[in-house]
């Protein structure tokens, strides 16, 4: 495995581990998700550049568009949760209220 691919896979795994272990605030979960999406975007962009195919060149832009939509929906949920509950703790946002 080349050092470039190792760095992107380790960035994805670090984001996944941050998402798994830092489950206290919604904002930290959103930042970990954004880090994972950024590493996926760069990996897919490099993959499409190595293929030299024009049909695969639109794939990173589609992923970036979905990432922006995910970020805007996540921030809207963060604002709504902060207004209704007063904090962004994930324990307060449990829908089952167990």
Curated annotation (Swiss-Prot):
Q: What topology in the membrane does the UniProt record assign?
A: Multi-pass membrane protein
Q: List, alphabetically, the Gene3D superfamilies matched.
A: 1.10.287.3510
Q: What is its EC number?
A: 7.1.1.2
Q: Which GO terms describe its molecular function?
A: NADH dehydrogenase (ubiquinone) activity
- Stretches that traverse the bilayer: 1-21, 26-46, 61-81
CC annotations in GO:
mitochondrial membrane; respiratory chain complex I
Function of the protein? Core subunit of the mitochondrial membrane respiratory chain NADH dehydrogenase (Complex I) which catalyzes electron transfer from NADH through the respiratory chain, using ubiquinone as an electron acceptor. Part of the enzyme membrane arm which is embedded in the lipid bilayer and involved in proton translocation.
Q: What is this protein called?
A: NADH-ubiquinone oxidoreductase chain 4L
To which species is this protein native? Squalus acanthias (Spiny dogfish)
């Amino acid at each position: 495995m080349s050092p470039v691919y190792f760095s992107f896979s380790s960035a994805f795994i670090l984001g996944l581990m941050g998402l798994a272990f830092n489950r206290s605030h919604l904002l930290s979960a959103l930042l970990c998700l954004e880090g994972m999406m950024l590493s996926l975007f760069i990996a897919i962009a490099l993959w499409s550049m190595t293929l030299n195919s024009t049909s695969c060149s639109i794939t990173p832009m589609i992923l970036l568009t979905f990432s922006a939509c995910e970020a805007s929906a996540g921030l809207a949920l963060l604002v709504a949760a902060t207004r209704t509950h007063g904090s962004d703790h994930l324990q307060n946002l449990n829908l089952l209220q167990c």
